[in-house]
Amino acid sequence: MRKYLPFLLSLLLAACTEKVDLQSVSDYNDYLVVDAVLTDNPDHEQTVNLSRTVSYFFDEEPPRVQGARVSVNDLVFEESEPGVYLAPRGYHCEPGTKYHLQIELPEGRNYEADASMPERGFRLDGIDYAFAGNKSMGLDSLWTLAIWGKDDAIASYYHITLGVNGDYYPFEYTQFMDDKYFNDKEVKGFPITTLVQSEVLRKRYGDAFKYLETGDVITLRARSLEKGYFDFLLAQTLNTTSIPIFSPQPANTPTNIRGEHVLGWFAVCPEFYASVTVEDPFRPYYKKLFPWF
């Protein structure tokens, strides 16, 4: 996500301005972008990413913010590469703990934010796949993914990512959703998302978009989100579709980072996974629903 967040937020800055001076697009580089998402998974690298917004009008990499002091609850994150601040190996967050992020830039500006982990919200027992056809909507092939489990009675919000053999979809192909269709219910074979194979996408993003073969492992990774972070992510995906000329102006993008000229979010999320091994990539039904087939 850190590659796309500065660009997406730059689009929102442009879209939220009634009059845009094309000669002063460098002004958008004045905003710090904070991408800080920590999880309860000790095997997941816990990072805080700092960059600057980039102009909507130029194809350029977001400038990385180097030399900052970044800490969470007084634990210092070390800069592992330009703009990427990494927690010690094995560090992870825990339910019921409040987390305080502090950022001090080399020029002396300070930023801070607070977050706590929401309840998991869903017990994920398993997933399954079904072939849905090929040459559909310009895609080479399409599969649907269904989930099994139990949703809690509380309102919950999720960020869902798919992976094939450990290669995961990029941020713009992930999914955000609430639980309005299965709140407080046992879930058996609910079609949650789709997996696509496209040679064009495979060449651009890697083997997450490969054609499924026997023995491939499909993994669904889900994160439970607090409502503010869900709204923030939704703003990145929905408001940027309104950029073309004559479209309505979106609302200002939300942030929970305190400080001047700053965008982004600090979130703490429980993370859970389920996987299925492909037996027959052309199987047109969920075997977990029809095990006798």
Residue ranges and their predicted role:
Residues M1-A14:
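Sec-dependent bacterial lipoprotein signal peptides
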Residues T17-F293:
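A sequence/structural signal for flexible, mid-protein segments enriched
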